[in-house]
A protein has these predicted regions:
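Glycine- and acidic-residue-biased ligand/ion/polar-headgroup-sensing regions
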Residues: 49-62
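Conserved short histidine dyad/triad with adjacent acidic residue
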Residues: 31-47
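Short acidic-glycine-tyrosine-enriched beta hairpin
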Residues: 66-82
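Histidine-centered metal-chelating micro-motifs
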Residues: 40-42, 78, 82-87
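A short, N-terminal "cap"/entry segment at the start of jelly-roll beta-barrel domains
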Residues: 1-31
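Ligand-binding loop in jelly-roll beta-barrel domains
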Residues: 82-104
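A short, compositionally biased micro-patch
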Residues: 25, 36, 56, 81-83, ...
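A cytosolic small-molecule/anion-sensing beta-strand core signal
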Residues: 57-58, 73-74, 92
């Protein structure tokens, strides 16, 4: 068992989103991405079976897909097949927690 405080472990970078590997196992991976306003994780996909969840735990922005956007704010969770194009854009400073199963 382990405990991690994401507010202490991962901060922000003025030039690009900041990534922190929270957990990696044969079963799932957890990542924390911190974005300054205007930064983004570009739309992308992975050629494999599995699912991804993106949970906003601070800030506001947009969940991105190939052809559209959806508002994203604190408490929102996007769940998608990992092969479906997905991304995130921050409108304010924003922290998200991404879970990938199985891990890539």
């Amino acid at each position: 068992m382990k405990k991690i405080n994401l507010y202490e472990e991962n901060d922000f970078n003025e030039l690009h989103m900041k990534r922190f590997l929270v957990h990696d196992s044969p079963y799932f991976k957890i990542l924390n991405f911190n974005f300054k306003a205007g930064q983004e994780l570009p739309v992308h996909s992975h050629d494999m079976e599995g699912q991804v969840s993106i949970m906003v735990f601070e800030g506001k922005g947009e969940f991105l897909s190939k052809d559209s956007t959806m508002p994203a704010r604190k408490g929102d969770v996007l769940i998608s097949e990992i092969s479906e194009p997905h991304g995130v854009r921050a409108k304010t400073d924003m922290r998200v927690l991404v879970t990938i199963a199985p891990p890539i």
